[in-house]
């Protein structure tokens, strides 16, 4: 989450007149994340999250995202529920942007994920995959493999200023990853960005899965690969196979992986590392200096990619 667009008290008060959630008591910007402008909103009726959509989000995709969230919430998944205005709309204009209000979920995200977090995460992700099976609309993954070469091209040679030779290393890894990319694996709706700051815990149980604005219809095992990257590396970039094993066991207790999915884990993990390296690099270059936003170091994913390039099989991930 982040803040790019400022909202005045008067504009927000007028916006809330269209909703049955009471009057504004307080609101503040949330600096974490890099995508949309987000505010914590308290009204006389309770706590909510206000999101103004920015940057990579295509307005045409918003009904799909919010529809998926409503669908998953109806299946008892702990995800935000979009709040509809009096006229039934869940998207409305505010401060020159399209905006939505969603319910607030209690809990905190784990700053230092442990093995105890990884098992519940895997199980929750599998339940999410199964719960989305009967959500009929589909959405192509704009940041899937076909999107990585043009993203690298847009970064130009700027990667070499971050680390000498980075652009060439990433290009070589990308070419090899695309050549080995699996196509015929089970697919459905995935979160595609299930990082620790998008997962809330309360009393050692998952209380919230948030930020579905990269969700898409893609390989289930790719969603797992994203999480292996995000949850299973230590601060020194060593891979924690105990965390990985817990995550995979938690997932497979709900939805067992096929042999082909298991075999594909190394290349899927390489692809996930490349995806986040590239988007972080692009944001590193292009984030405005005055934006209330936390930029993330692209090299965090360079070192992850180095591990995946050396992985010989799924056994290196604890399978």
Swiss-Prot record:
Domain of life (superkingdom): Bacteria
Xref: CDD domains: HomoserineK_II
Catalytic activity: L-homoserine + ATP = O-phospho-L-homoserine + ADP + H(+)
Sorted UniProt keywords: Amino-acid biosynthesis, ATP-binding, Kinase, Nucleotide-binding, Threonine biosynthesis, Transferase
GO molecular function, one term: homoserine kinase activity
InterPro entries given in the database record: Aminoglycoside_PTrfase (IPR002575), Homoserine_kinase_II (IPR005280), Kinase-like_dom_sf (IPR011009), Pseudomonas-type_ThrB (IPR050249)
Pathway noted in the entry: Amino-acid biosynthesis; L-threonine biosynthesis; L-threonine from L-aspartate: step 4/5
PANTHER family (UniProt xref): AMINOGLYCOSIDE PHOSPHOTRANSFERASE DOMAIN-CONTAINING PROTEIN (PTHR21064:SF6), AMINOGLYCOSIDE PHOSPHOTRANSFERASE DOMAIN-CONTAINING PROTEIN-RELATED (PTHR21064)
Family: Belongs to the pseudomonas-type ThrB family.
Name of the featured protein: Homoserine kinase
Organism field: Acidiphilium cryptum (strain JF-5)
Chain's gene name: thrB
